[in-house]
Amino acid sequence: MSLPDISRRRSPVPQEDWPLTPNALRPSPFPNPVLQALYSLSRVLLFPTYWSLDQLLGCWAPSVRSKSLGWFKVLAGSGVLLPLVVVGLPLALVGLALWLPLQVWRRPFCYQPPPACWVWPQPWHPPAERRRCFVFLTANLCLLPHGLAHFNNLSHSLQRAEAVGAALLDSLQSSQYRVSECSQPPPRVPGGELKATLPMGLDFVCLQEVFDLRAARRLVRVLVPNLGPVIYDVGTFGLMAGPYIKVLGSGLLLASRYPLLRATFRCFPNARREDAMASKGLLSVQAQLGIVDGHPIVGYLHCTHLHAPVEDGHIRCKQLTLLLEWVEEFEAENRQSDEAVAFSVLLGDLNFDNCSQDHAKEQGHKLFSCFQDPCRLGVCQEQPWALGTILNSSMLRHSIACSPEMLRRALRQEKGRRLYLSGPLHGSYPAQSWKGRRLDYITYRRVPGSRLSPEAEQVTFSTAFAGLTDHLAMGLKLQVVCS
């Protein structure tokens, strides 16, 4: 896919001493190139067996077995792939012996800075510019390794990553990176809309389930020259207390239009079943946004993906409590006394909804007294315009579910929502208010003592990734006003 560099086409603006702290993050996750080279070698040794096992697992997925000649394909594929696994095992054991101890020195994320020709967005300078809007996007892409993706009725993760990148690129090119215009005054109640495209003027993008590193790198190649710095390959791998062996990362990927000052990742200590193999946790970053009275303006983003199994609500509640503790710790440790904080945003796939009785504990968690959810009115009460974000897995290959515009039209009607969205786990809505299950959240809060006040202006539910994942993308336009 050709990746035009729209950063070169933007008109540079006078930006003396901006960013205030350039190159704040080291690109490599290792402190020296020798460790990085050894880590790359370990991945090369592991890859043949990883690929063979991945393809073998894909052969046994229910979606493959149910097709015509399904069992014949399963047996034929297994007959070819099993010998490849056996042949690759000696190399894999050497690679594993090298890979495991290297995790001690590995920082839990990779950082890709923008190119040298990159022009940063114009810094925010209140009170001359009293208000500025920031646009956030969250999306669960289900970019699992090929075999695991089949179990979600999806496949071809690398091809889907290319298509997701094309959709993101189209949004970035269309917006041409003008600063998003704000409503004056800000609306008393945020509005919501359903679109077949992604929000324009994206400033921050948080993606979940980008587990496949090859897929992550394809997204990085799109985002870095057209949006800004990217943090990817996030997670703590290797042997953990439990005991667990973490072979998958967190699946988180974060891209920012603004310079990033600091970043950290913390892995949840509690996990069960299939989630025990993944390094789910909280990625926290501090971004530079502008300057007020000679002092820096910063914003905090906290991206996460909670425990998945439906019946494990107690684990999700513990993770939510940990999230709040880690958010407070990160912001307290990194905030300087002279900094003005524009916002603190927590976003991602929380894996519970606001309509199912099975999620009563999560719905009443103190998270919602600390952070504002613009889609939520209360426990089991959503805004009239709010929508579910998880699709019905049995309909993912339907022609309408694979077309952004056709899916958007279908979801405008209750009949379409009931057909293409996943419904509550137990019980049902009244007929006039059926919305589906919203697992994706973008929440925000004002930091006490700050003269900057954030307010939600617009929430967007997007079908732009129709046919590419089992979630709708979700966007938030946040207006920050300097008092």
Curated annotation (Swiss-Prot):
| Membrane topology recorded in Swiss-Prot or TrEMBL | Single-pass type II membrane protein; Single-pass membrane protein
The reaction(s) catalysed by this protein are: a sphingomyelin + H2O = phosphocholine + an N-acylsphing-4-enine + H(+); N-(hexadecanoyl)-sphing-4-enine-1-phosphocholine + H2O = N-hexadecanoylsphing-4-enine + phosphocholine + H(+)
Q: What is this protein called?
A: Sphingomyelin phosphodiesterase 5
> What keywords would UniProt list here?
Endoplasmic reticulum, Hydrolase, Lipid metabolism, Magnesium, Membrane, Metal-binding, Mitochondrion, Mitochondrion inner membrane, Signal-anchor, Sphingolipid metabolism, Transit peptide, Transmembrane, Transmembrane helix
Activity regulation per the record? Activated by anionic phospholipids, specially cardiolipin and phosphatidylserine.
Tell me which species this is from.
Mus musculus
Catalytic residues (positions): 471 (proton acceptor)
Binding-site residues for Mg(2+), renumbered to this chain: 209
Stretches the record annotates as Disordered: 1-20
Task: Please give the function described in this protein's UniProt entry.
Answer: Catalyzes the hydrolysis of membrane sphingomyelin to form phosphorylcholine and ceramide.
Its cofactor is:
Mg(2+); Mn(2+)
Q: Which GO terms describe its biological process?
A: ceramide biosynthetic process; ceramide metabolic process; sphingomyelin catabolic process
Where are its TM segments located?
A: 80-100
Which protein family is named in the record? Belongs to the neutral sphingomyelinase family.
The EC number(s) attached to this protein equal 3.1.4.12
Q: Where in the cell is it found?
A: Mitochondrion inner membrane; Endoplasmic reticulum membrane
Marked site positions, Important for substrate recognition: 351
Chief location of this protein within or outside the cell: mitochondrion
On whether Metal-binding is a keyword of this UniProt record, the answer is yes
* Gene symbol of the encoding locus: Smpd5
Cellular component (GO) terms are:
endoplasmic reticulum membrane; extracellular region; mitochondrial inner membrane; mitochondrial membrane; mitochondrion
Q: What is the relationship between pH and activity here?
A: Optimum pH is 7.5.
User: Listed GO molecular functions?
Assistant: metal ion binding; sphingomyelin phosphodiesterase activity
The pathway to which it is assigned is: Lipid metabolism; sphingolipid metabolism
